[in-house]
Amino acid sequence: MPDYEKQKRNAAVEAASYVKTGMVIGIGTGTTARYLIEELGRRVSEENLKIKGVCTSKKSEELARAAGIEISENPEQIIDLTIDGADQVNLHGTLIKGGGGALLREKIVAYNSKEMYVIVDSRKIDDENFGSFPLPVEVVPFLHRMTLENLRKICPSTDLRKNSDGTLFITDNGNYIADMKFGRIRETNELEKKIKSIPGVVDVGLFNNIADKIFEGNDDGCNIYVVSEKGRIEKEKGQFK
């Protein structure tokens, strides 16, 4: 059976090898990003790597500080490179993100970066079933029931995310997450615009035209894909199939 944790680690370690001293690095959130933080922390300790990290969640910031990474909460310069995971990736390089509830900060950091690298295991690139992972939408608490009903006009199977104890999940920004269960998504640009046009919606976990490279870990190493000018992901040497 595939070792998905090993795959995540392989993707994270390969992407981390692109980080150089002096860079400001956007640090993602989630299980794969944890391996990134571990590797960056190792390089800080063993290789004297000097970087500043901009974290996309309080949890990632906590892990990064513990790993010895210097944190910059509001950098004056543009972020050189953001490395983050994804819940799903299609063949156009569009991402579904927000499974960990940090989609707003993740999008802000990625948007303000020179480049964004995505680290995933071998399950995550799935064009045919893109949208089978629920699409997270961050909404403000004020009149959230009305916002939820407006989202249900687009996708009837939409519910507010809850914690294991039944309480509503609250983001680091004090907002709620609505998960939209489409099953399949095709017109990602139009869908993003439609959802964001609803008052009460802060942002949506569709990342269009943001990713530059995809690092897909496998049991033996890592495949690297670039998002071409044609809007397709391609192997750095040869077409993705």
UniProtKB/Swiss-Prot annotation:
EC number: 5.3.1.6
Catalysed reaction equations from the record: aldehydo-D-ribose 5-phosphate = D-ribulose 5-phosphate
Pathway field: Carbohydrate degradation; pentose phosphate pathway; D-ribose 5-phosphate from D-ribulose 5-phosphate (non-oxidative stage): step 1/1
BP GO terms, sorted: D-ribose metabolic process; pentose-phosphate shunt, non-oxidative branch
CDD domains, A to Z: RPI_A (cd01398)
Signal peptide: none
Active-site positions on this chain: E106
A cellular component term, taken from the record's GO annotations: cytosol
Role of this protein: Catalyzes the reversible conversion of ribose-5-phosphate to ribulose 5-phosphate.
Family: Belongs to the ribose 5-phosphate isomerase family.
Identification of the protein by name: Ribose-5-phosphate isomerase A
